[in-house]
């Protein structure tokens, strides 16, 4: 599928020579990589680790940033880690193009940080939640230590650990044990710590899931804001994250990648 807002952007041989020089003159793209750089349709590029996929992505982003005609709509680049952002900082951070890519209107970061920034955090703040810490291990430990000693002992005898102290699958749902009093206490501790601003990474995605289910206009607004999406390290994106991405960027049956 051709991405509508890119219809008037063409990547030429001159652009590729320019970006090779921009990246220090140490990169030279062969014909297969040139074809990938010039492609303006949705595509899944698969290659073995170390083959230079992220380098190609950074080069393409640099060219697109140079030609980008929109001041309020941006390019969205997501990855499992911050590898794409780090490579842009390393190769292009001291250039005008690099600074453009790393600032508004573009977004380059992890899947988690994207949904936090544009879905979960705005909803939580608008509903009166303060945000203090988003960290799975720290929040597990905090909640576990808020349980009475006898309840922790009971859970340990059920072969449960600190990881039980978070919502699972949906907001308000937990991994339940046989003792209903313990279940109610777990739910109470989770709810109280969330009111105090403490969330796990997984819970933030669950809130994103909840918001996207309840507010159809949010995916449309995000698509207008980011008409093009790149996903690096796609093989590391789990099923739950893919479902969220498809909910946001898949309005016409295809991801705008």
Language model features with spans:
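P-loop NTPase Walker
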Residues: 1-124
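Conserved P-loop NTPase motor core of helicases/translocases
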Residues: 2-20, 129-147, 207
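Conserved helicase NTPase motor core
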Residues: 16-49, 181-257
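Residue-level detector of secondary-structure transition/capping positions
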Residues: 65, 93-96, 123, 172, ...
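ATP-hydrolysis module of ASCE/P-loop NTPase motor domains
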Residues: 102, 123-188, 192-199
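Solvent-exposed, flexible loop/coil residues
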Residues: 118, 137-138, 203
């Amino acid at each position: 599928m051709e991405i509508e807002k890119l219809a008037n952007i063409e990547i030429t041989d001159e652009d590729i020579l320019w970006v090779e020089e921009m990246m220090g003159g140490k990169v030279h793209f062969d014909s297969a990589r040139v074809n990938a750089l010039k492609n303006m349709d949705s595509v899944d590029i698969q290659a073995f680790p170390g083959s230079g996929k992220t380098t190609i992505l950074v080069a393409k982003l640099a060219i697109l940033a140079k030609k980008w005609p929109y001041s309020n709509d941006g390019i969205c680049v997501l990855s499992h880690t911050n590898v794409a952002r780090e490579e842009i900082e390393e190769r292009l951070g001291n250039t005008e193009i690099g600074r453009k890519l790393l600032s508004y209107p573009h977004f380059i970061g992890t899947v988690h940080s994207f949904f936090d920034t544009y879905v979960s955090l705005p909803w939580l703040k608008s509903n009166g939640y303060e945000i203090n810490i988003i960290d799975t291990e720290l929040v597990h430990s905090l909640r576990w230590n808020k349980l009475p000693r006898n309840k922790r002992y009971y859970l340990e005898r059920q072969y449960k650990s600190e990881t039980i102290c978070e919502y699972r699958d949906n907001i308000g749902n937990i991994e339940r044990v046989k003792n209903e009093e313990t279940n109610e206490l777990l739910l109470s501790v989770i709810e109280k710590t969330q009111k105090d601003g403490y969330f796990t990474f997984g819970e933030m995605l669950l809130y994103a899931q909840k918001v996207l289910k309840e507010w159809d206009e949010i995916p449309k607004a995000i698509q207008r804001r980011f008409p093009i999406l790149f996903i690096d390290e796609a093989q590391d994106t789990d099923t739950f994250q893919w479902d969220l991405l498809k909910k946001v960027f898949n309005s016409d049956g295809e991801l705008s990648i």
